Structure formats: C-alpha cells, structure tokens
Amino acid sequence: MGRLIFLSFGWLVVFLSLSGTGADFQCPSEWSAYGQHCYRAFSDLKTWEDAEKFCTEQEKAGHLVSIQSIQEANFVAQLVSGFISGSPKIYIWIGLRDRRKEQQCSSEWNDGSKVIYVNWREGESQMCQALTKWTEFHQWLNTDCAGHYPFICKSRV
C-alpha cells in the first residue's frame, strides 16, 4: 500500500512538472504572454478613448495595458522598444487617465484593477497617461487624451 502511494505521488510530481507553471496558455497570434495576460502593441494612431474601445473589441476583450509591478513595466518597455522606431518623442497609450472627482485622481486602471504600482515622471499625474521613448518606455507622462498615438492592449487569458 505504501509503495502504491509513493508511486502515485511520484507520477503526480512528474505530471505537474511537465504541465508547466500555469503559463501553458496560448495567446492569439501576434500577442505576447506575460503572467496570466496577453499583450500586443498596435501602431494604429488613436485617441485614448478610441484605443481603449479598440482593445475591448479584440478577441480576448481586453483594455489598454495596466502595469502592476516593476517586472511588468520592464516587460512592457521591452515589448514596445522592439516595436517602435523613429522620433524619440513618440507616446504609447496605457490604461490610466485622470478621472478627477473633487480634485482626486482615480485609484483604478481602466480595467478596474487597483493602482498599486506607479512610475509617473516627476510633475506628471493628470490627463491621460502614456509611455514615451525618451524614458525608454519606463516612466508615465501625461498628455492630451485627444492626441493620436500607438497603444498596447492587455487581456486576461
């Protein structure tokens, strides 16, 4: 009996190790996986509102990217830096905008997740937020929501 339990446990360990770490999912073609999400940068130039709408209409019905940690910020920066060329002043929309209610900034990303990690450039914290090439896509800068820029969508697996 003890040997059967030992063998069963051994097979369970082998099965779990072969099945991976929980990232055994397929993102749609041209999307990149990180954690439990799929990401894709789009070169289409859209306003913040139009970019958010576009992201919600994708196959996985996502949102403009929310960034919850320095590790995720580094992943997004790497994804974007391989995608964008040209002017160092290019902006990339992310899913955060100033929704002021009595002079208080929103504490939620547009996907409803809490803002637990921030990386605003000094003096920046209003309007719509974007990454910019001159900070190597790491810091968040505010810009007019009516501007037309590329963007990154993020969707749950």
Swiss-Prot record:
Tissue: Expressed by the venom gland.
Cell compartment(s), UniProt: Secreted
S-S pairs: 27-38, 55-153, 128-145
Main subcellular localisation: secreted
UniProt keywords, alphabetically: Disulfide bond, Hemostasis impairing toxin, Secreted, Signal, Toxin
Family the UniProt entry places it in: Belongs to the snaclec family.
UniProt-listed PANTHER family: MANNOSE, PHOSPHOLIPASE, LECTIN RECEPTOR RELATED
Assembly description: Heterodimer; disulfide-linked.
Further remark: Shows greater sequence similarity to the alpha than beta subunits compared to other heterodimer snaclecs.
The protein, known as: Snaclec 3
Source organism: Bitis gabonica (Gaboon adder)
